[in-house]
Swiss-Prot record:
Identification of the protein by name: Thiosulfate sulfurtransferase YgaP
Domain comment quoted from the record: The catalytic reaction induces conformational changes within the rhodanese domain, as well as in the transmembrane alpha-helices.
Source organism of the structure: Escherichia coli (strain K12)
Name of the encoding gene: ygaP
Gene Ontology MF annotations: thiosulfate-cyanide sulfurtransferase activity
Catalytic activity field: thiosulfate + hydrogen cyanide = thiocyanate + sulfite + 2 H(+)
Induction context: Part of the ygaVP operon, which is repressed by YgaV. The operon can be induced by tributylin (TBT), a toxic chemical used as a biocide and in textiles and wood preservation.
Compartments, record wording: Cell inner membrane
Principal cellular location given in the protein's record: membrane
Length: 174
């Protein structure tokens, strides 16, 4: 089912007329940065619990970070929100910001966990390669180990590095 994609400015007009804006990103992404009018309903929660019945007769605009998550899950979102009139925000919150519309940013919140994993994994791989060339070839094993961990995470859905980073003090929420 093809859902209508709308521009940020069109979405803002619909919101002003009572449409509900639903952010399907994870809580850590939302807490760091979100559109002020958006309500958080992560895709994983929507899949389990569905949409509240009171919203099923509203206009609903779903959004994510860049629009990919909403477009990839358009059929699921349509089924979850039926019979509501459903729209997808073009380019997600990134498009909203590019259009010059306001976002609420909380820099005291940590970066989203997956970004932390990408930074840590990329840094460890780079360190392993640089040290492997300059100090001792044994350091290449570090890069191989991190690469194997990422491969395992992709296949199994379990990311040990994400679990470890989630336990770090800066990721502990009060």
């Amino acid at each position: 089912m093809a859902l209508t994609t709308i521009s940020p400015h069109d979405a803002q007009e619909l919101i002003a007329r009572g449409a509900k804006l639903i952010d399907i990103r994870d809580a850590d992404e939302y807490l760091r940065e979100h559109i002020p009018e958006a309500d958080l309903a992560p895709l994983s929660v929507l899949e389990q619990s569905g949409l509240p019945a009171k919203l099923r007769h509203e206009q609903i605009i779903f959004h994510c970070q860049a629009g990919k998550r909403t477009s990839n899950n358009a059929d699921k979102l349509a089924a979850i929100a039926a019979p509501a009139e459903i729209f997808l925000l073009e380019d997600g919150i990134d498009g909203w910001k590019k259009a010059g519309l306001p976002v609420a940013v909380n820099k005291s919140q940590p970066l989203p966990l997956m970004r932390q994993v990408q930074i840590a994994a990329g840094g460890l791989i780079l360190i392993g390669v640089v040290l492997g060339y300059t100090v001792n070839s044994g350091f290449f094993l570090l890069s191989g180990f991190v690469g194997a961990g990422l491969l395992f995470a992709g296949i199994s859905g379990f990311c040990g590095m994400a679990r470890l980073l989630d336990k770090m003090p800066w990721n502990q929420r009060a």
